Amino acid sequence: MIQHLALDALQRHLAGSPLYGWATSLPAQIAARIEEGHGDLARWWSAVQRLPQVPAPKVELAQRFALHSDHDAALQAQVKEALQGLIPWRKGPFDFFGVQVDTEWRSDWKWERVSPHVELRGKRVLDVGCGNGYYQWRMLGAGAESVVGVDPNWLFLCQFLAAKRYLPELPAWHLPLALEDLPEKLEGFDTVFSMGVLYHRRSPIDHLLALKDCLKRGGELVLETLVVEGDASTVLVPEDRYAQMRNVWFLPSVAALELWLRRAGFADARCVDVSLTSVEEQRSTEWMRFQSLPEFLDPQDRSRTVEGLPAPMRATLVARKP
């Protein structure tokens, strides 16, 4: 499996950069992770391998993720069967040769909110908590030189490799690692994204410091997270669950988040978007059949979660490493 992560190509790409030493250490580190394995990894990897090996003569990444070809319905059925072996699909949507993977999240809506505020042309990008890589492909579509994603979830890796199977030459890599597995003071990326991660961290300031460690001087952080209304002293800490999620720790106000960024040593922090998450943006589908946002909100008052807390509101902030 490890050869399909294209770590040799990543090393070649990073040769001569501050990241090259790190890249040379990755094969041993990831081989150890694969050795640890996961009970479903063999099944998921088998689904990836069932995808037909056909060319994708036309690829769309700028406006959406879509692979096009002139292949017939039999090929579409084969593609769909393999991709269904990777359910649930959380982030997307994807179009694989006419097979529409209608994911739980309309991640394209978030990208439409975020991308106008970030210049990625020619940039070396790190996407922390990259999920199945949907945003990595869209970042390439926005002109990024290369995108490395880190996420320890094996299903997400296999979903990424399903797309990579048809885009082997594109400079996108998914590493089955957590941010904590990266070396300190990496300082090699022009832009670092952390979207939908901060509220899962027990120590949000430490997360911001670790993100800063990955950036070059002058590099840019793009931070997207759950927020609440309030001033710089407002932070919501759920008593137990938030929207049925157990692993949610801190929901700051935008002003508090800007303060956290300054305390972590970032400069020029600014909020570029605040949006309530709608039940059209996050919902159950054929490709993600479990409960989703409509079930996590109070049926009598959609402005509250089932726990009586403010409904999900997300902010995107951009800041610079001095």
From Swiss-Prot:
GO molecular function term, any single one: methyltransferase activity
Oligomer and partners: Homotetramer.
Protein name, per record: tRNA U34 carboxymethyltransferase
PANTHER family per UniProt: METHYLTRANSFERASE, TRNA U34 CARBOXYMETHYLTRANSFERASE
Enzyme class: transferase
Residues that coordinate or bind carboxy-S-adenosyl-L-methionine: K91, W105, K110, G129, L179, E180, M195, Y199, R314
Substrates-to-products reaction catalysed: carboxy-S-adenosyl-L-methionine + 5-hydroxyuridine(34) in tRNA = 5-carboxymethoxyuridine(34) in tRNA + S-adenosyl-L-homocysteine + H(+)
Gene responsible for this protein: cmoB
The protein's Enzyme Commission number: 2.5.1.-
GO biological process, one term: tRNA wobble uridine modification
Keyword Manganese: no
CDD domains: AdoMet_MTases
Domain of life: Bacteria
Similarity remark: Belongs to the class I-like SAM-binding methyltransferase superfamily. CmoB family.
Task of the protein: Catalyzes carboxymethyl transfer from carboxy-S-adenosyl-L-methionine (Cx-SAM) to 5-hydroxyuridine (ho5U) to form 5-carboxymethoxyuridine (cmo5U) at position 34 in tRNAs.
Pfam family, one: Methyltransf_9
UniProtKB keywords: Transferase, tRNA processing
